């Protein structure tokens, strides 16, 4: 079985995260940069319902974050998780595992 592994890390920890995944045996990945916030970041206040104001507040409080996505064999998952825990033990991260029910790859020459 294959798993879509999604590893969310702060941008400054991207190198450590990719190294952990590579050592764990991933064959490739793609990543997406975004602005991230944890529940603690917005605890205690409500966002204004005006879109411009809400976007401004989110931009001011959020952190530069990256999600790294990789399809992995379930047999590699334990090793990958162990390496991520070890390399990012003092850093914030979130690891999400989603089952892949199907996949089609088209690679014309």
Swiss-Prot record:
SUPFAM superfamilies given in the database record: GlnB-like (SSF54913)
InterPro entries, alphabetized: N-reg_PII-like_a/b (IPR011322), Unchr_N-regulatory-PII-rel (IPR019296)
Similarity comment: family membership: To M.jannaschii MJ1244 and MJ1245 and M.thermoautotrophicum MTH1110.
Name of the protein described by the UniProt record: Uncharacterized protein MMP0618
């Amino acid at each position: 079985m294959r798993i879509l592994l999604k590893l969310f890390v702060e941008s400054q920890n991207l190198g450590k995260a990719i190294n952990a995944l590579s050592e764990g045996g991933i064959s490739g990945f793609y990543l997406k940069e975004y602005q991230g916030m944890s529940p603690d970041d917005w605890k205690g206040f409500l966002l204004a319902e005006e879109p411009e104001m809400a976007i401004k507040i989110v931009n001011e409080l959020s952190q530069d974050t990256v999600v790294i996505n990789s399809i992995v064999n379930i047999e590699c998952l334990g090793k990958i998780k162990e390496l991520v825990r070890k390399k990012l033990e003092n850093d914030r991260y979130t690891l999400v595992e989603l089952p892949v029910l199907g996949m089609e790859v088209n690679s014309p020459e």
